[in-house]
């Protein structure tokens, strides 16, 4: 049995396969996920798990060099990301553009978060 890290086998598998500049998205409950993109649905209940809960676990195994989020996202949402990835580069685009960009991600992780615009694309970095 695995002792540490991410215990969700689908998320662990996707992160292990990511290369530099590959992208994954963490999205809220209502985000439209393209049908051709791998969907990892971890919704447990209305509001659970939150974006932040999922982000914290993913960061145990993923090096992130850039976060793409919508202009419409709240300052609190941006602060959550900054607190968890202090030196990350941000790219802000419209929510519509963010939805289009999810066509090019390796996978979308759907959370139970119900705070509007709690969606981000994480761009994989390198550890050296």
Curated annotation (Swiss-Prot):
Pathway(s) of this molecule: Carbohydrate metabolism; D-ribose degradation; D-ribose 5-phosphate from beta-D-ribopyranose: step 1/2
Enzyme class: isomerase
InterPro entries (UniProt xref): D-ribose_pyranase, RbsD-like_sf, RbsD_FucU
Keywords: Carbohydrate metabolism, Cytoplasm, Isomerase
Enzyme Commission identifier(s): 5.4.99.62
Physiological role: Catalyzes the interconversion of beta-pyran and beta-furan forms of D-ribose.
NCBIfam families tied to this protein: PRK11797.1
Subunit structure: Homodecamer.
Name assigned to this protein: D-ribose pyranase
Organism: Thermosipho africanus (strain TCF52B)
Origin organism lineage: Bacteria, Thermotogati, Thermotogota, Thermotogae, Thermotogales
Underlying gene: rbsD
